[in-house]
């Protein structure tokens, strides 16, 4: 018997049966009213799901979710907010994992599937947010720009080898490029939300190197800066290819020297997370290996010291 059906039996059917039985014994003419009350209670239970969060993701089948809002971040970056079936629903996405989006694109021989990490979490019920940059050659990212409010997107998940758990290591170093910030933000927010001062137990130290081309390309900078300001164990080092005058962060590409200065040194309780454009990730794999970190595998596993999303 499923948890839901067991809950329904204990929460609705047994009390309802007792109500009907008691009414029949005490006053038979009130039985129709008791039946009506029972039907209403059962309907409310079925419709609301008991107001408990329901995980809606399915790892084997695509489901369609309705676009409810589009928030422009820049000329080519947008936050897409998709509604879940019920206001109390959650995606059910473990921290560190991602989802697959699928669409039929004109000119493509088969359905196109791409992976994205929501910037929202299961702490926010009723919807999920995707931060997406539209690339000229990006099939799904361009497809998303054509969606209108009320249109649907096919989603499947969760997927991915990374599942973050509190205190899985002492210190995490992160290197992100562009929209590669999304899985990092997911983990950063989860760690800070679970700090001892917030009633949790996560003491993991976090250091982030975030590389972009121009200042306007730094996604979610305001939120990242706010998180760093409130948490002394989270530090950010920004790197720009085209820095403005007076820039105090890094300049050019992320170098081994930057990694050595701003991220934790290799140790058994240290993990390095990478996410960004393929050329950047290739360079960062070589850089981390040159500094003594364990060589990154072609396909990362949870236990790897250097993990690539």
Swiss-Prot record:
Gene3D superfamilies: Nucleotide-binding domain of ferredoxin-NADP reductase (FNR) module, Translation factors. It comes from the Eukaryota. Residues 60-165 form the FAD-binding FR-type domain. The keyword Transferase applies. FAD binds at residues 145-160, 171-208. It is an enzyme of class 1 (oxidoreductase). It is a single-pass membrane protein. The chain crosses the membrane at residues 30-50. It is found in: Mitochondrion outer membrane. It catalyses: 2 Fe(III)-[cytochrome b5] + NADH = 2 Fe(II)-[cytochrome b5] + NAD(+) + H(+); 2 Fe(3+)-[Dph3] + NADH = 2 Fe(2+)-[Dph3] + NAD(+) + H(+). Its EC number is 1.6.2.2. Keywords: FAD, Flavoprotein, Membrane, Mitochondrion, Mitochondrion outer membrane, NAD, Oxidoreductase, Transferase, Transmembrane, Transmembrane helix. Pathway: Protein modification; peptidyl-diphthamide biosynthesis. One of its GO terms (biological process) is tRNA wobble base 5-methoxycarbonylmethyl-2-thiouridinylation. One of its GO terms (cellular component) is mitochondrial outer membrane. Its cofactor is FAD. One of its GO terms (molecular function) is cytochrome-b5 reductase activity, acting on NAD(P)H. Monomer. Component of the 2-(3-amino-3-carboxypropyl)histidine synthase complex composed of dph1, dph2, dph3 and a NADH-dependent reductase, predominantly cbr1. NADH-dependent reductase for dph3 and cytochrome b5. Required for the first step of diphthamide biosynthesis, a post-translational modification of histidine which occurs in elongation factor 2. Dph1 and dph2 transfer a 3-amino-3-carboxypropyl (ACP) group from S-adenosyl-L-methionine (SAM) to a histidine residue, the reaction is assisted by a reduction system comprising dph3 and a NADH-dependent reductase, predominantly cbr1. By reducing dph3, also involved in the formation of the tRNA wobble base modification mcm5s 2U (5-methoxycarbonylmethyl-2-thiouridine), mediated by the elongator complex. Belongs to the flavoprotein pyridine nucleotide cytochrome reductase family. PANTHER family: NADH-CYTOCHROME B5 REDUCTASE, NADH-CYTOCHROME B5 REDUCTASE-LIKE. This is NADH-cytochrome b5 reductase 1. The gene is cbr1.
């Amino acid at each position: 018997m499923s948890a839901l059906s067991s809950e329904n039996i204990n929460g609705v059917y047994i009390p309802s049966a007792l109500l009907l039985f008691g009414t029949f014994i005490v006053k038979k003419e009130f039985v129709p009213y008791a039946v009506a009350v029972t039907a209403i209670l059962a309907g409310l239970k079925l419709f609301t799901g008991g107001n408990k969060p329901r995980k809606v993701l399915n790892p084997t089948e695509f489901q369609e979710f309705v676009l409810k809002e589009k928030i422009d971040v820049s000329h080519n970056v947008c936050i897409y907010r998709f509604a879940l079936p019920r206001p109390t629903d959650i995606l059910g996405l473990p921290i560190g994992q991602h989802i697959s989006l699928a669409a039929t694109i004109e000119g493509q021989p088969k359905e196109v599937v791409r992976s994205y990490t929501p910037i929202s979490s299961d702490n926010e019920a009723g919807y999920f947010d995707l931060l997406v940059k539209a690339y000229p050659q990006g099939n799904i990212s361009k497809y998303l720009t054509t969606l209108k409010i009320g249109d649907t997107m096919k989603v499947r998940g969760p997927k991915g080898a990374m599942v973050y758990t509190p205190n899985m290591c002492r210190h995490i170093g992160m290197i992100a490029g562009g929209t590669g910030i999304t899985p990092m933000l997911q983990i950063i927010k989860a760690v800070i939300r679970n700090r001892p001062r917030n009633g949790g137990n996560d003491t993991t130290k976090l250091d982030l190197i975030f590389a972009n081309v121009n200042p306007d390309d730094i996604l979610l900078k305001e939120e990242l800066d706010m998180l760093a300001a409130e948490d002394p164990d989270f530090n950010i080092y920004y790197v720009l290819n085209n820095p403005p005058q007076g820039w105090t962060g890094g300049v050019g590409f992320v170098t081994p020297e930057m990694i050595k200065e701003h991220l934790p040194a290799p140790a058994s309780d240290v993990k390095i997370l990478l996410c960004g454009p393929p050329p950047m990730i290739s360079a960062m794999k070589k850089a981390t290996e040159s500094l003594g970190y364990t060589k990154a595998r072609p396909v990362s596993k949870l236990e790897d010291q250097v993990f690539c999303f």
